[in-house]
Regions:
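Active-site acidic catalytic loop and adjacent metal/ATP-binding pocket
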Residues: 28-39, 46, 178-222
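Active-site activation/catalytic loop segments of kinase-like enzymes and analogous catalytic loops
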Residues: 73, 220-256, 274-295
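Conserved NTP-binding catalytic cores of kinases and kinase-like/nucleotidyltransferase enzymes
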Residues: 1-98, 203-207
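ATP-dependent phospho-/nucleotidyl transfer catalytic cores
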Residues: 111-192, 203
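Short alpha-helix boundary/capping segments
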Residues: 63-67, 119-127, 216-219, 235
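Conserved short submotifs of the Hanks-type protein kinase catalytic core
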Residues: 100-111
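Regulatory N- and C-terminal appendages and interdomain linkers associated
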Residues: 1-28, 263-266, 270-273, 277-305
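Short, glycine/acidic-rich hinge or "gate" loops at secondary-structure transitions
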Residues: 95, 142-153, 257-264
Length: 305
């Protein structure tokens, strides 16, 4: 397709006409763009328009293509079960043919979620932790088709090239053991898979999440370890007990009263170091030069392997 299919977008959004209002941002590695459209009834919508480069069929390209199938599956079957405690945009329409994907979503800005940040602090970070806790509690123990068997964009099975690029032999050898600890956890849930600050949109009193290309199974602490990695006020140990306490307080509130929250917290809190090491493993192979300057990450690896 040479251009954005505005008639189809208008149709699935319940409007007569749609007009491209402007680009919000490009997708990773030039794989498309996020576009805002104006509808003739006064509403707006956000369109994720993914168009992988022609002929891109390497491991990285195939992973991204799979992610463009996963996200519509999330919005079709999982998003309707998310309420205000783990708010996500509503799906208006989706289609994909293996070479191009269109995802038409509610415009969260129009719903009041206009705030963005590269590093949430204070009440904003607490809201993100509460969102994650609610999401993790909601899907605890469920097997959900259509998403990744193992959630997160850095999980080992899809990052073999990065594994081979790791200079640290101990971290490289430890990688499958770390992955096995996470996939073998007793308490599995649905994780966001890319729970960085930039994927949360804030209203004055709440928060919503976007970008579910890498959602899949895993212990919820994987999302938390990723979210808390490398923050400006991170403790020297790399283990932010105060914020972990906040997350587990929110998780206990979200879980059914009959659930053994103590056992869940023991396992997931005990896996925090493992989840953080697993992300360090990815960083070390993905961007070796950047990892070489990550003194805190390297110190954490030395202290925990």
């Amino acid at each position: 397709m040479s251009g954005l299919d505005l008639p189809w977008i208008a149709s699935v959004a319940g409007a007569r006409r749609a007009r491209r209002a402007g680009r919000i941002q490009s997708l990773w590695a030039g794989y498309g763009e996020l576009v805002r459209v104006d509808l003739d009834d006064g509403r707006t919508a956000v369109v994720k328009w993914a168009r992988p480069p022609a002929g891109a069929r390497d491991v990285s390209a195939l992973r991204k293509r799979r992610s463009f199938d996963v996200e519509p599956a999330f919005y079709r079957s999982i998003a309707p079960r998310c309420d205000d405690a783990c708010r996500v945009p509503a799906l208006l329409g989706a289609r994909g043919d293996g070479d191009e994907w269109l995802l038409v979503l509610e415009d969260l800005d129009a719903a009041g979620f206009t705030g963005r940040t590269d590093e949430a602090t204070g009440p904003q970070l607490d809201r993100v932790l509460a969102w994650l806790a609610s999401f993790h509690a909601r899907f605890l123990g469920e097997h959900i088709d259509g998403v990744w068997p193992t959630g997160s964009y850095w999980h080992l099975d899809t990052r073999r090239d990065e594994l081979a690029a790791i200079d640290d032999p101990l971290l490289r050898v430890s990688a499958p053991l770390l992955a096995a600890r996470l996939t073998g956890a007793r308490y599995q849930t649905l994780i966001h898979g890319d729970a960085k600050d930039a994927n949360f949109c804030f209203s004055p009193a709440s928060v919503a999440a976007v970008d579910f290309q890498y959602t899949g199974a895993g212990p919820g602490i994987v999302d938390v370890a990723y979210l808390l990695y490398g923050r400006a006020d991170e403790p020297a140990s790399g283990v932010d007990d105060a914020r972990l306490d906040l997350y587990f307080d929110h998780l206990r509130t979200a879980l059914p009263a009959t659930f053994d929250a103590d056992a869940l917290e023991r396992e997931w809190r005990g896996l925090y170091v493992i989840a953080r090491l697993d992300f360090c493993r990815f960083l070390a192979g993905w961007r070796p030069a950047m990892w070489a300057s990550d003194a805190r990450g390297q110190r954490f690896v030395r202290a925990n392997t």
